[in-house]
UniProtKB/Swiss-Prot annotation:
Its EC number is 6.3.2.8. This is UDP-N-acetylmuramate--L-alanine ligase. Cell wall formation. The keyword Transferase does not apply. It catalyses: UDP-N-acetyl-alpha-D-muramate + L-alanine + ATP = UDP-N-acetyl-alpha-D-muramoyl-L-alanine + ADP + phosphate + H(+). It comes from the Bacteria. Belongs to the MurCDEF family.
């Protein structure tokens, strides 16, 4: 039985969330009646309103109105007044992943999983499928610059979704194609231990039907190990590894562009397809790896090499993924969502390869628990930055942990041999600190999942305001 058009008004609690908003938008585009609520106004909320979706600010029982179905994310607490009211009315309460799974049943589905790189890879797969004329429906975990939104309603038979592993619900998604970019010990508050994370990703691939396939990164040791344990499913490997079925090589970085070749080898026939001189307007080996995953999917779906090259060259990127927010005095300023040591290291390596001058990193750690569990990894992930400014931890509702703060992290980074790590007491001092050290040709990269994105947006004008003043 498929999702009927007669389910009535669907109410989303927390509709402004990046995962919830995309599902709400696609449901609305399919002709369902949709409304929702969120704690605060936001760009996502306004975007949904512009499409005719009613959104209430604040959570109150009366917001449900005539709703017949309620959708919630795992972030919504049992004490939420709207959730309490829904259960009192005996309304069906649907988890975000369950509703996403229902939408996926209408299409052949590609689910992009992994602890890092999901959003960019989802966007790249969508871009290549669009270039190949497949007109996909897309639900992503970030704003795709070409769409100005995180969702796209297509007329084709394929759907591309980001599969969020954080709460285990990605295992509910009925994917025909499953992509795994990497596997790191994340979300242990939910899983309990790393073995449980490994088991979840194995099940994610093995859930694919016999006529589907998995696409797995051979450069990541955990994923390579998993490849050897998958039985009775077709697997396509990718990466820089010479043993990969779809391999990238001959990488050249030209400013903020990546130029590379890809070799596709068919195991059964021995056929080799070469894609030479591919251009992607985004730097970094991690992004080339993500692009190679997308190429593996696109090639398998029959998209021509010419369309793959055309789509890749047109890729407009994802909001908050090495996004240029402005320039000042020959200094380029970038905003990036990176908040895990693996992500930070990859972004700064890309900046180092692209930059003619020095790299200045500004980081706002996200959550005390993450900083505590990965303290040594954070201390070692900034080596490609010439200067580091560390802001206070963005708590995200957590209580402080004694001895775990940015001052301690600065001290640990310095003791590890870094020449210039400093504590940034608050955002108001950032323009002055940047102006004192930045020179023409330098990159300033602001990284984090908290409020730092607003600093990145404001910094170019703030620096202009300092021009003419003594610094």
């Amino acid at each position: 039985m498929k999702l009927p058009k007669t389910i009535g008004l669907v109410h989303f609690i927390g509709i402004g969330g990046i995962g919830m908003s995309g599902i709400a938008e696609v449901l609305h585009n399919l002709g369902h009646k949709v409304q929702g609520s969120d704690q605060a106004d936001s760009a996502n909320v306004q975007r949904l309103r512009d499409k005719g979706i009613e959104v209430f600010v604040g959570h109150r029982a009366e917001n449900l109105g005539e709703a017949e179905v309620v959708v919630v994310s795992t972030a919504i607490k049992k004490s939420n007044p709207e959730l309490i009211a829904a259960r009192e009315k005996l309304l069906p309460v649907v988890r975000r992943a369950e509703m996403l799974a229902e939408l996926m049943r209408f299409r052949n589905a590609i689910a992009i999983g992994g602890t890092h790189g999901k959003t960019t890879t989802t966007s790249l797969v969508a871009t290549l499928l669009e270039a190949g004329g497949l007109d996909p429906t897309v639900i992503n975990g970030g704003i795709i610059n070409a769409y100005g939104t995180n969702a796209r309603m297509g007329e084709g038979e394929w759907m591309v979704v980001e599969a969020d592993e954080s709460d285990g619900t990605f295992l509910k998604l009925p994917a025909d194609v499953a992509v795994i970019t990497n596997i790191d010990p994340e979300h242990l508050d939910h899983y309990g231990n790393f073995d449980a994370v490994r088991a979840a990703f194995r099940q994610f691939v093995e859930n694919v039907p016999f006529y589907g396939f998995g696409v797995m990164c051979l450069d990541h040791p955990e994923v390579q190990s998993l490849v050897g344990r998958i039985e009775d499913r077709k697997i396509i490997t990718y990466g820089e590894n010479p043993q990969a079925d779809v391999r990238f090589k001959n990488v050249r970085i030209d400013g903020t562009r990546s130029i590379f070749d890809v070799e596709i080898r068919r195991r059964r026939t021995g056929q080799v397809i070469e894609l030479k001189g591919l251009v992607m307007p985004m730097p970094g080996r991690h992004n080339i790896s993500n692009a190679t995953a997308a190429i593996a999917v696109a090639n398998r779906l029959g998209i021509s090499s010419a369309d793959i090259a055309k789509g890749l060259a047109s890729f407009g990127g994802v909001k908050r993924r090495f996004t240029l927010t402005g320039e000042w005095n020959g200094v380029q300023i970038f905003d990036d969502y990176g908040h895990h040591p693996v992500e930070i290291k990859a972004v700064l390596r890309a900046a180092r390869e692209s930059c003619k001058g020095r790299v200045i990193a500004v980081h706002q750690p996200h959550r005390f628990s993450r900083l505590a569990s990965l303290f040594e990894e954070f201390a070692a992930c900034f080596n490609d930055a010439d200067s580091i400014f560390l802001a206070p931890v963005y708590a995200a509702g957590e209580d402080p942990i004694e001895g775990i703060d940015s001052v301690s992290l600065v001290s640990r980074i310095k003791s590890g041999g870094h020449r210039d790590a400093r504590f940034l007491t608050s955002a108001e001092f950032l323009p002055q600190m940047v102006a004192e050290v930045a020179k023409p040709g330098d990159f300033v990269v602001l990284l984090g999942a908290g409020s730092i994105t607003s600093w990145a947006a404001a910094l170019p004008k703030q620096l202009e305001g300092l021009s003419g003043k003594s610094v």
